[in-house]
Regions:
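Membrane-water interface segments at the C-terminal ends of transmembrane alpha-helices
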Residues: 7-41, 50-163, 191-216, 243-262, ...
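Peri-membrane helix termini and adjoining interfacial loops of integral membrane proteins
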Residues: 34-45, 116-128, 218-227, 268-275, ...
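Short amphipathic alpha-helical coupling elements at transmembrane boundaries
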Residues: 45, 90-93, 126, 167-175, ...
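Glycine-rich helix-loop "coupling/hinge" segments at transmembrane-helix boundaries
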Residues: 113, 212-238, 476-504, 538-541
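Flexible interhelical linker loops that connect adjacent transmembrane helices
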Residues: 264-294
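Short cytosolic juxtamembrane segments of multi-pass membrane proteins
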Residues: 270-281, 361-362, 528-545
C-alpha cells in the first residue's frame, strides 16, 4: 500500500495560481482604491441615466461592427497570404502584426491625412471633379480606424492557424481532389474556427473599450464609448463613483464575452507535422487573381496612412529635432519600459498557460478557462481606471515613488498579457498534446521541460508575443499620462507635449521616429529565433539528450 502523501497542490498548477492571484489582486486593488475614494452617490440615479444607456448601446454597436468588419475579411486575406509568395510578403506580415500596437496618435494622424476633408483622397476627388462626402469623424471614422488597427492582427492570427494545419491533411485532400468549398469546410475551417471566436472576442473588447481613437475621431457626445465616459467622469466631473460603475459594467460585458468565446471554441487534435509554403497542385489563374486583388486591397488600407506619417515627418525640422537631447532621453526611456514590460508579460503569460493547458488536458476545461480569464481581466479593466487606482493606492499608502519606471513597466506588462495569451494559447496547448507522453516517459518536467521542450518548440510564438508586448508598451500613453513629467517622459508623452504646444512640425518628426522605432523593434524581436526556426523543431533531439 502506498504511504507517500500527495501534495495539496500539484507542481504544474502552482505557476498559474501564482500568476492569476497576482493579476486579479492588482486589478481588484486598483478598482477598490477608486471605489473607496469616491464620495457617496445614488447608484439608482446613475442606473436610470439615459446618457449612460446611450453610451452602452453605442459601445456595443460600434464594437460589434468593428469586430465583424475586421474578422470576416481577415479569413479570406489569411488564406490568400498563405497560398502566395511574393516580394515584400514578410514585411507585410510584420506590418499586419504590429498595426494593432502602433501608437494610436500616430495612426490617427495618418488616417486623417489620407481620409480627412482636406486629405489626399479629398484632393484627388477635387481634381477629378468628384465631391468627397466621406467624413473621418463619427461612427464611420471610428470603424475605419478600428479596421485599420484590428483586421491585420486578425489576419495574422488566422494565418498562424492555417500554418498549423498538418501537411498530411493537405496532401490527402489533394489526392482526393478536394477543392473549393469542400476543402475550406473540411480542412481549413476546423483550424480557423478555434481562432476566429477568440480573435473576434479580443477585437470586440479592444473596440468596446476604445479610448484614444474615439476621443480623436468621435466627433461629439453621440459617439462616445464607456472608456471615454470614464475619462470624462474622472477628468472633467471628478465623479469616481460614476467611473467605478462604468468600469464595472465594462468588465462584466467583456469578461462574459471572453468566457462565451472560450466555451464555444473547440480544441482539435494536433497533427504530425507542418509544411510551410504548401503548393496546391490544383491552383489556377482565377485563384491567383482573386488572391492578388485581396492582397492589393489590404495594402491600400494599410500603407497610405503610414506613408502620410513618413512624408509629413520628413520636413525641414527633422535635423533640429534629432539634435535635441530630450528626444533621445525619451527614446531610451521608451526602450527601457518596452523591454522590461515585454519580458514580465511573457513570464506571467507562460505561467498562466502552463497550468491552464494541463487542466484542459485533464478534462477540466472550466478551471483552465478561469485561469486564462484572469489574464483577460486587465483588458476588460479600463486602462485609465487601472492607472488612477494605482495613483490613489500609492498616494494613500507608501506615497508616490520618485521614479515611475517600476509602476509604468509593471502596468504595461499587465495590459499586454491578453495579446500574449492569444498568440501563445494554441501553440502551447499543441506542444503539450504532442510531447506530454514523451516527457512523462522520460521524466522531463519543471525547468528541464521548459528549457529543453517549451523554449525550443515555441521560439517563433514566443518571439511574436514578446514583439507584441514590447511595441504595445513603447506606444502606450494612458499610463504615462498620469506619471509623466519633465524628468520622466516617453516618446508618446513627448509627442503629446509637442502637439499641446502647437509644434506640429516637430510632432510630425517625433511621430515618424516613433513609427520607425516600433517597426524596427518588432522586426528585430521576430528575427531572434532565426530564419529557419520551426514551431516544433529540435524537440525530439532535445528529448533524446
Amino acid at each position: 500500500m502506498a504511504t507517500r502523501r500527495q501534495p495539496l497542490i500539484v507542481g504544474w498548477l502552482i505557476p498559474g495560481l501564482c500568476a492569476a492571484t497576482l493579476v486579479v489582486a492588482v486589478a481588484l486593488a486598483a478598482f477598490m482604491a477608486l471605489w473607496f475614494n469616491a464620495p457617496q452617490t445614488d447608484i439608482r440615479a446613475l442606473l436610470q441615466d439615459s446618457y449612460l444607456w446611450h453610451v452602452l448601446r453605442f459601445s456595443f454597436w460600434q464594437a460589434f461592427l468593428s469586430a465583424a468588419l475586421s474578422v470576416f475579411p481577415a479569413i479570406f486575406l489569411a488564406r490568400a497570404l498563405y497560398r502566395r509568395r511574393f516580394p515584400g510578403r514578410v514585411a507585410l506580415l510584420r506590418l499586419c502584426a504590429m498595426t494593432l500596437v502602433l501608437p494610436v496618435l500616430v495612426a490617427v494622424f495618418g488616417i486623417l491625412t489620407v481620409y480627412g476633408r482636406e486629405g489626399w483622397l479629398a484632393s484627388l476627388c477635387d481634381r477629378l471633379g468628384i465631391e468627397w462626402a466621406f467624413s473621418p469623424y463619427g461612427l464611420k471614422g471610428i470603424l475605419l480606424a478600428h479596421v485599420f488597427f484590428n483586421m491585420p492582427m486578425a489576419t495574422r492570427l488566422l494565418l498562424q492557424a492555417l500554418e498549423n494545419i498538418p501537411s498530411e491533411q493537405r496532401q490527402v485532400a489533394a489526392q482526393l481532389g478536394m477543392q473549393g468549398w469542400n476543402f475550406f469546410r473540411f480542412v481549413e475551417w476546423p483550424w480557423l474556427r478555434r481562432q476566429i471566436l477568440p480573435a473576434a472576442a479580443l477585437i470586440f473588447m479592444l473596440c468596446f473599450a476604445s479610448f484614444a481613437t474615439v476621443l480623436s475621431l468621435g466627433g461629439g457626445p453621440q459617439a462616445t464609448t464607456i472608456e471615454l465616459a470614464i475619462f470624462q467622469a474622472l477628468s472633467y466631473d471628478y465623479d469616481p463613483a460614476r467611473a467605478a460603475l462604468l468600469a464595472l459594467v465594462q468588465m462584466v460585458c467583456c469578461l462574459g464575452l471572453v468566457l462565451m468565446s472560450q466555451r464555444l471554441s473547440k480544441a482539435i487534435a494536433p497533427g504530425i507535422s507542418q509544411m510551410q509554403g504548401w503548393r496546391d497542385p490544383q491552383d489556377n489563374l482565377r485563384r491567383k487573381l482573386c488572391d492578388g486583388v485581396l492582397i492589393t486591397l489590404a495594402l491600400l488600407l494599410l500603407l497610405p496612412p503610414l506613408l502620410a506619417v513618413i512624408i509629413d515627418g520628413m520636413n525641414s525640422g527633422f535635423s533640429s529635432v534629432l539634435s535635441q537631447p530630450i528626444l533621445w532621453q525619451a527614446l531610451f526611456t521608451s526602450l527601457r519600459i518596452a523591454v522590461g514590460a515585454g519580458l514580465i508579460c511573457i513570464a506571467i503569460t507562460m505561467m498562466l498557460l502552463w497550468s491552464s493547458r494541463e487542466l484542459r488536458l485533464r478534462n477540466r476545461a472550466f478551471a483552465g478557462q478561469a485561469l486564462e480569464l484572469s489574464g483577460m481581466l486587465i483588458l476588460a479593466m479600463p486602462g485609465i481606471v487601472l492607472a488612477t487606482g494605482f495613483f490613489l493606492l500609492l498616494n494613500n499608502t507608501v506615497g508616490l515613488p520618485q521614479s515611475a519606471d517600476g509602476i509604468v513597466i509593471f502596468t504595461n506588462a499587465l495590459m499586454a498579457i491578453p495579446y500574449a495569451l492569444k498568440v501563445l494559447e494554441n501553440p502551447m496547448l499543441d506542444v503539450a498534446e504532442r510531447y506530454n507522453k514523451l516527457c512523462q516517459s522520460l521524466n522531463i518536467n519543471g525547468l528541464n521541460r521548459l528549457r529543453y521542450i517549451e523554449l525550443r518548440a515555441l521560439k517563433r510564438p514566443l518571439a511574436q508575443a514578446l514583439a507584441f508586448a514590447c511595441v504595445l508598451s513603447i506606444g502606450d500613453f494612458g499610463v504615462v499620462a498620469l506619471f509623466g513629467n519633465d524628468d520622466f517622459r516617453t516618446l508618446p508623452f513627448y509627442l503629446y507635449q509637442q502637439i499641446g504646444s502647437y509644434r506640429s512640425q516637430d510632432g510630425a518628426v517625433t511621430a515618424l521616429i516613433l513609427l520607425i522605432l516600433c517597426f524596427a523593434l518588432f522586426t528585430l524581436i521576430e528575427k531572434l529565433p532565426g530564419r529557419h526556426s520551426q514551431n516544433h523543431s529540435g524537440c525530439g533531439k532535445a528529448a533524446s539528450e
